[in-house]
Curated annotation (Swiss-Prot):
Protein name, entry field: Plant intracellular Ras-group-related LRR protein 7
Function: Leucine-rich repeat protein that likely mediates protein interactions, possibly in the context of signal transduction.
Cited SMART domains: LRR_BAC (SM00364), LRR_TYP (SM00369)
Family stated for the protein in its record: Belongs to the SHOC2 family.
Gene3D superfamilies: Ribonuclease Inhibitor
UniProt keyword terms in alphabetical order: Leucine-rich repeat, Repeat
Disulfide bonds: none
Spans of repeat LRR: 52-75, 76-98, 100-122, 123-145, 147-169, 170-192, 194-215, 216-240, 241-264, 266-286
UniProt note on tissues of expression: Specifically expressed in flowers.
Stretch list, region Disordered: 25-49
Amino acid sequence: MICEDAYQYQQLHGQKDHMMTMMMMDLSTSPPSSPLSPSLSPKSPSYNNNEEERLEVVNLSGMALQSLPNPSLNLANICKLDLSNNHIKKIPESLTARLLNLIALDIHSNQIKALPNSIGCLSKLKILNVSGNFLVSLPQTIQNCRSLEELNANFNELIRLPDNIGLELTNLKKLCVNSNKLISLPATITCLTSLRVLDARLNCLMILPEDLENLINLEILNVSQNFQYLSALPSSIGLLLNLLELDISYNKITVLPESIGCMRRLRKLSAEGNPLVSPPIEVVEQSLHAVREYLSQKMNGKLVNTAAKKKTWGFRKLVKYGTFNGRSRVWTREEREGLIMPEYRPIDILTSTKFPVTCSPRRLFSPRTYFSR
């Protein structure tokens, strides 16, 4: 039976009067005090011969299990199965194929290297936690888990996600794949229109999908700590109009897309640890409002470009300048006052015939010519 190891564990601790089937718990009646203490037994007043109620939850967490023997239980009646914190290396294909009414499966913190293809038979599965294993990939059949709302695959060795992951999992609300080795996210991920949380930090992401605006319900996006890999964000990121939190910290991003200035619902922006040039780091350190205003003005062409003005010639106000006195062998520097021009003009205009007296090169640079005080 699937609870054989649990029974042996209880025998070692003097709990011989407990039955193996007591690991089957109905949480709707009364929650167990511990994984080893059953809530229902054949002698308990709340015991019900209705097998469908009795076999609602199976909790085998922290039992030091190394394998799962072929169970003789009616697995079709189990709604929740917790096999976390064990030493399990493989999930039998026959097990998942018979869990027809399973809603939640927790196998985190084991030694599993691959999920069975029969996981696609879990058409009612809503919560799947496979974090803390040695998974390199997820089976393509996971797309058949169309009721899935939460997928946690943190702390694995995932190199890629299934290409079709976004085509069928239209009910997925939370996708956590942090602390893996992902280089990119599949393009179909933008089809997850119900997605609210996307956590892809601590990976090797080099690029994000272009059509992020399709994630119309996304509220939290975390792509931080991809370090030397992620150097740019797609402009479509600013079209995530329902986004509340954006974490892009500790990457190689130098420019924030101007479209971020349109994200009026954004409440938190974390961008530290990036070599930002636009907006300047001093703007980022001020506030989220300052960043939004900077990017909005830049997008609308209202941002003052001081660097461009330095390349123009002309005078905006009366200034002091120096000339050399040509009447003496010893050249002495004298300060003179320049002219006030109404606006900036390039040097080719200043040297034209429109300004023959006041601004010709001969008048400007001759050592024997002076401006009056």
